[in-house]
From Swiss-Prot:
GO terms for molecular function: dITP diphosphatase activity; ITP diphosphatase activity; metal ion binding; nucleotide binding; ribonucleoside triphosphate phosphatase activity; XTP diphosphatase activity. Substrate binds at residues 7-12, 69, 148-151, 171, 176-177. It comes from Flavobacterium johnsoniae (strain ATCC 17061 / DSM 2064 / JCM 8514 / BCRC 14874 / CCUG 350202 / NBRC 14942 / NCIMB 11054 / UW101) (Cytophaga johnsonae). This is dITP/XTP pyrophosphatase. GO terms for biological process: nucleotide metabolic process; purine nucleoside triphosphate catabolic process. InterPro entries: dITP/XTP_pyrophosphatase, ITPase-like_fam, RdgB/HAM1.
Length: 192
């Protein structure tokens, strides 16, 4: 089965493809000649995932799935949330985003946070929504070189390492995206 993933983020595509059974092949937006930026104008993570999946299905006619992820930090009222990718500005720079977040939490003892991924799947005229959450805390410094985004400053519950220090296989099992993707896989393998 071939399925379009409404993303050109090569890190995300590789991470998700590594979790899928060999029978499911991901096509990127580039693979279907979609080079425009898909609007992410919703004010929720769920809303953005739906917007992206619907855009590809309606404009290009493909069954597809899309995701949106946000980091929600308790001490700053759930920020950066839906604005996680552009928290420090439209340039979407991960280091700038992490630095801004670390500055916002400076001298704050409450560092509780959660990553939330929502995947919307448009398949054969039906829409499915899957949510994965990984609870943890924001560290005081960046540690590790694996992963991307906020991974160097997010330490998942019951671990003494950040996502950026953990092997991809472990992150995929305990992480927000991995949990949502597993729900996607369960549905796709059940409907074959």
């Amino acid at each position: 089965m071939k399925l379009v993933f409404a993303s050109n983020n090569k890190n995300k595509i590789a991470e998700i493809q590594s979790m899928l059974p060999e029978s499911i092949t991901i096509l990127s937006l580039e693979d279907i000649n979609c080079f425009e930026d898909i609007p992410e104008t919703a004010d929720t993570i769920e809303g953005n995932a739906i917007l992206k999946a619907d855009y590809v299905t309606q404009k290009y006619g493909y069954d597809c799935f899309a995701d949106d992820t946000g980091l929600e930090v308790d001490a700053i009222n759930g920020e950066p949330g839906v604005y996680s990718a552009r928290y420090a500005g439209e340039q979407k720079n991960a280091d700038d985003n992490m630095n801004k977040l670390l500055k916002a939490l400076e001298n704050n003892k409450n560092r509780s946070a959660q990553f939330k991924t929502v995947i919307t799947l448009n398949l054969e005229g039906k829409q499915y929504i899957f949510t994965g959450i990984a609870k943890g805390e924001i560290t005081e410094t960046k540690t590790g070189t694996n992963g991307f985004g906020y991974d160097p400053i997010f330490k998942p519950e019951n671990f003494d390492k950040t996502f950026a220090e953990l092997p991809l296989e472990i992150k995929n099992t305990i992480g927000h995206r991995g949990k949502a993707v597993q729900q996607l896989i369960d549905l796709l393998t059940a409907t074959k």
